[in-house]
Amino acid sequence: MPNFLSNKPIPVADRLIMALDLPDVSEAKTLVERLGDAVSFYKVGLELFMSGDCFALVDWLKAKDKKVFVDLKFFDVPETVGRAVKALSRRGVDFATVHGNDAIMEAAARNKGSLGILAVTVLTSLDQGDLRDLGFQCDVQELVLSRARRALAVGCDGVVSSGLEVPLLRGEIDHELMVVSPGIRPVENRPEDDQKRVVTVDQAFRNGADYIVVGRPIRDAADPREAAQRAQAQIRDVFAAG
């Protein structure tokens, strides 16, 4: 098993990013309150943004001293993406995603301020068959590596990548590249869902991820706080073992 354990000065508790995949702000706030100090970093995505009052949620999270990752995968003409990123950076958000060509990624990076820009490589819900259906002639690893190299070249801070491809990134690209890995699933009782390229907490970090994003395994647990605490304990154990 590879060991590309991150040596970036990131507080261990911040390495777990909880995905607030919920239908409205009220439910999101209820879950945040329930999780308490078990989670310090939250991801807000399309579902919550479409529900309304999402910027009020972002401000509320920041007021509670939480870190915020806005995952909207900006993909529009470069001018529009640049302006959107600039507006978002004023909210004190920590990370945001972009999913486009070099010009789009460069516009985001140029207007980021203190915001960390993460380029999406290949969604964890896609596999090799899906790429073929989309017209790609390369394999998943080749596409992830190509997109990561281009993102770094135009000024992005990091990428979003399945933990399966992170060892390749660590072996081929500057170790300072920030890598956030979604698609985290438990070893046992792994649910059947739309995630196709998944890893465990331990695998993600040993493969070189700096952060992991966990949603359903915590959100849908009988006791979400206990599930989050268990994930945090796993992360502490990985870094303590080195």
From Swiss-Prot:
Enzyme Commission number(s) of this protein: 4.1.1.23
GO molecular function, one term: orotidine-5'-phosphate decarboxylase activity
Coiled coil: none
Reactions that this protein is recorded to catalyse: orotidine 5'-phosphate + H(+) = UMP + CO2
Protein name per its UniProtKB record: Orotidine 5'-phosphate decarboxylase
Family matches, as Pfam families: OMPdecase
Positions of the catalytic residues: 73 (proton donor)
